[in-house]
Each structure stands twice: as C-alpha cells, then as structure tokens.
C-alpha cells in the first residue's frame, strides 16, 4: 500500500526538514541551466520555480537532476500550474545585504525548497481536486506587494532623483500594456572555449505606460515562458504589477529601459481593493494605439497641413535640431521646408515599397502573414468574410541632398505618397519594371521643394522619423535662390 503523503503549508517550513511536501501555485519560472558535471561525466541541470500557496507566502524551489529530468520539468511545468512538490529539502535563505544582486525572486518567508532527483519530485496536482486548484490559481492575480508602493514611470525616467547618474537598479511599477512587438531572434556568442558557437535567443519588447508617462517605456522579456504569456497581453487592457523589474540605460535606445530579469515577478491584471487599476485602464483608453507604431507603420496620424509648414532648414539644420546642438528636449517633433535634390529613389529595386496594415486595429501586418494575427481582429473578421482585411500603403525611403549634406531617413509614405506619385499603392504593385523605372526617373536627380515632418528619437523608438508631407519640382534658379550656408 502506497504511503500517504502529508502536505504542509509554506508557512510551516523549518530549516531542519528534509522530506517536506506541499501543494502550491507556480507564479514564475526560470529557464533551465544545463552544465557538464565533471564528477559524474554527465550533463546535469537546475530549474527554479517561484511558488505561492497563500497571499502572504511565496518562495523559490530549485529542482536539480540529470539533464533529461530537468528538461522534462521545464516542458511539463508552466506558470499558472498547481503542483505537488514531494520530498523537498528545506533550506534557510541567507541574508542578502541591501543592493546585493539577486538571481531569483525575493521570498516572503525565511526558507526555500530544493528538490533533488531520486529523493524528491514535482508533478502536476490532481485535476480532480478542482476546488483547491481554483483557490490557488486565484493567487495569480493577487498582488505580491501593495499596489500603492510603486514608482511612477516619470520618476524612473528622471533617473530616480539622480538625472546626472545613470544607475542600474530594480523597481516596482504598476503599468498598462500599450503595445506588444513581434518576437525578435538575437545571436549571442557563448563564453569560454566555445566562443565561436552562437546561441540563438528570443526577445519580446513590450511598451508600457502609466498616467505620469504616456510616451511609454520599453520592457524587454527574454524568458521563453514569459514571452509566451506576454504574447497574450492586450494593449490598453492588460495591467501589470512589476516587482523588481530591472531599470538600466540602453546605449541602443539611448534612454532608460525596463528588463524582466531572474528576480522579476509579474502579476497580470492584479485584483486588489482600491481604484489603482481602474484609473490606469481609464487613462489607457484615452491613449491612441498608433502612438507606439513608430517607424513600422508609414501612415502617421495628425499629419500637418502643407500650408502650415513654412520654416526653411538645411539638412544640417534638421539634424542639429533633431539630435545635435540645437535640439530642444521639450519638443518631440517639428516641421521644415527643404530645398534640395533627390539622390536616391530606388523604386525599381528589389526592396518592397508597399506595406499592409489591418483595417481593424490599424497595425502593421508582417510580410509572412496573410492577415493580422490579433485574436480580437480574427474574431472581428469572422463576422464578415467579404470585407477587406488589410489596406496597402506606400513606404518608400528617399534621400534628399543639399549643399550641407544628405537626409537619409526621409520616407514618402501613405496618402502623401499616392498624391505625389499619382497612383495608389495597389496600382504600383501591378506596374512593370520598365514603368517603375520611368516613375523613378521623374524624381531622381531632380530639384524639389520638400515639406517634411520630423519626429525625434524617443525611448520606445530610438531612430529619427522623417516623413514627406509634400514635394514640388522646382527649377535650378529657385534652388540657388534659397541656398543658405548652414
């Protein structure tokens, strides 16, 4: 007859226990760490689970074993699962000095668990015990720390009170998702003797906002399980309580960014007393989604009227005002009239100049997809199969040069592109190569008066966006008459 397992609560853990068993909810999970064990001559590994069995009790459980065992745990155990942890060893958590780097989430109790292959194990809890599973899974949405004890994004952006010192630290935030970008694959060289071997990592970038900073901050997610969950987050609907999220300065984005690290905990759509989440969602509903499309979507909202663009600038002046010595940090965009020559307009090349956006959410559709992948959009389309699901629009890179330099970021896009080129995006795709070449030479190496809208780099978009609002062909005499030195 099988021995009946005695399950205990996390609050009952004592450092002297060597066969501790409990039923708990997985609220976070690390990636498996696999290494070569010289003593046994085999590959071993460790997987860390962060578990919780009540609103006040949370700790970590490390699962050690042969690689096959750890890989099986990694595939079987997911965030949100209720599990039985059997035969674990209870370990006292050593004291960590303030500011000391941590490699796992901070526990709310003084002990942690260790499960060794052969003496203990972790399995999914019996599905027939529906009552306990339901109770424990509700903890997934209960805040781990008070929602009132969070910082505002504006405070983080200002350098946590030290704007002259860029520091790396961990903070607690209450934010709402504004945009979820596609997963990117990044190659990283492995350290040591295998330095020529490259590891393929996945990264998901999420833009989060709060009422103090509607421009948004970038949150990078690297852990595969959290990437999978983040892909289900809905813009303006998913609230995140971020615990110990890493804040650091990114040279690539040239601003402070957030990162999900080994010690970070995320509570999705926290359910707590008070109006914090309700007020945050109400604010998010007022923020347009297209604000975070950046350069991926060519059609920019609120295009200025052509007649309103009057300030003449050279290429050098545009760059100086956008990124150089003349920039004003309080101004995020401006307009300019540029007199110059079109020096690149590769309409007949191999690069595609037509993109597509979803008619429902107005977001860019990647070229490898037929329709928008959003569940909400798919549900919308299922109600009416005859309605077009996407709109094509121009997105053409154009180089403009004058006596001071070349503007390489300018783009002829959307409705202005159709007006200037004299045809729709759908019609352009049907042109023969000879016709595309003829269209190109109507502009290339010709002189134009170009009206531009310039959007300066911001934290969630680290590059300059320059959009052609209008352009008119001019004779050489007018170009010379409008030349300036700087």
Curated annotation (Swiss-Prot):
* UniProt GO MF annotations: single-stranded DNA 3'-5' DNA exonuclease activity; single-stranded DNA binding
GO terms for biological process, alphabetical: double-strand break repair; oocyte fate determination; reciprocal meiotic recombination; resolution of meiotic recombination intermediates
Give the DNA-binding residue ranges: 166-285
This protein's name: Protein hold'em
Organism this protein belongs to: Drosophila melanogaster
What this chain does, per the entry, is described as: Single-stranded DNA-binding protein required for meiosis. May be involved in the resolution of recombination intermediates into crossovers in the meiotic recombination pathway.
Disrupted-gene phenotype: Reduced meiotic crossover formation and sensitivity to the DNA-damaging agent methyl methanesulfonate (MMS).
Question: Is Transcription regulation found in the keyword set?
Answer: no
């Amino acid at each position: 007859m099988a021995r009946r397992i005695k399950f205990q609560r996390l609050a009952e853990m004592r450092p002297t226990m060597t066969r501790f068993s409990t039923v708990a909810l997985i609220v976070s999970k690390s990636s498996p760490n696999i290494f070569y064990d010289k003593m046994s001559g085999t590959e071993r590994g460790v997987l860390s689970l962060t578990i919780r069995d009540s609103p006040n009790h949370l700790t970590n459980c490390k699962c050690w074993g042969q690689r096959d065992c750890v890989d099986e745990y990694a595939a079987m155990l997911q965030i949100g699962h209720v599990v039985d942890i059997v035969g674990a060893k209870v370990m006292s958590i050593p004291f960590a000095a303030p500011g000391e780097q941590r490699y796992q989430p901070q526990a709310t109790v003084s002990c942690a668990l260790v499960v060794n292959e052969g003496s203990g194990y972790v399995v999914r809890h019996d599905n027939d015990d529906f009552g306990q599973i339901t109770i424990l899974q509700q903890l997934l949405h209960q805040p781990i720390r008070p929602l009132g004890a969070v910082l505002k994004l504006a405070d983080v952006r200002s350098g946590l009170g030290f704007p002259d010192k860029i520091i790396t630290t961990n903070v607690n935030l209450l934010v709402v998702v504004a945009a979820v970008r596609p997963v990117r694959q990044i190659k990283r060289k492995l350290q040591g003797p295998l330095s020529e071997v490259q590891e393929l990592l996945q990264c998901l970038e999420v833009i989060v906002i709060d009422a103090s900073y509607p421009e948004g901050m970038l949150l990078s997610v690297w852990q595969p399980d959290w990437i999978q969950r983040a892909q289900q987050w809905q813009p303006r609907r998913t609230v995140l309580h971020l615990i110990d999220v890493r804040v650091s300065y990114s040279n690539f984005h040239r601003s402070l960014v957030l990162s999900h690290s080994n010690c970070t905990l995320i509570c999705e759509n926290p359910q707590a007393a008070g109006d914090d989440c309700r007020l945050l969602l109400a604010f998010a509903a007022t923020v347009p989604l297209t604000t975070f499309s950046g350069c991926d979507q060519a059609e920019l909202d609120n295009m200025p009227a052509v007649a309103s663009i009057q300030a003449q600038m050279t290429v050098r002046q545009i760059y100086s005002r956008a990124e150089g010595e003349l920039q004003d940090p309080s101004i995020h965009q401006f307009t300019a009239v540029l007199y110059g020559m079109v020096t690149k307009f590769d309409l007949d090349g191999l690069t595609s100049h037509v993109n597509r956006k979803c008619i429902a959410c107005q977001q860019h559709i990647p070229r490898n997809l037929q329709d928008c992948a959003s569940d909400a959009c798919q549900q919308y389309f299922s109600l009416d199969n005859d309605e077009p699901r996407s709109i094509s629009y121009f997105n053409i890179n154009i180089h403009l040069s004058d006596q001071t330099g070349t503007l390489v970021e300018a783009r002829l896009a959307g409705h202005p592109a159709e007006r200037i080129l004299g045809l729709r995006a759908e019609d352009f795709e049907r042109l023969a190569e000879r016709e595309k070449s003829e269209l190109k030479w109507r502009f290339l190496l010709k002189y134009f008066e170009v009206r531009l809208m310039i959007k300066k780099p911001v934290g969630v978009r680290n590059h300059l966006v320059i959009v052609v609002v209008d352009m008119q062909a001019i004779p050489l005499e007018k170009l010379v008459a409008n030349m300036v030195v700087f």
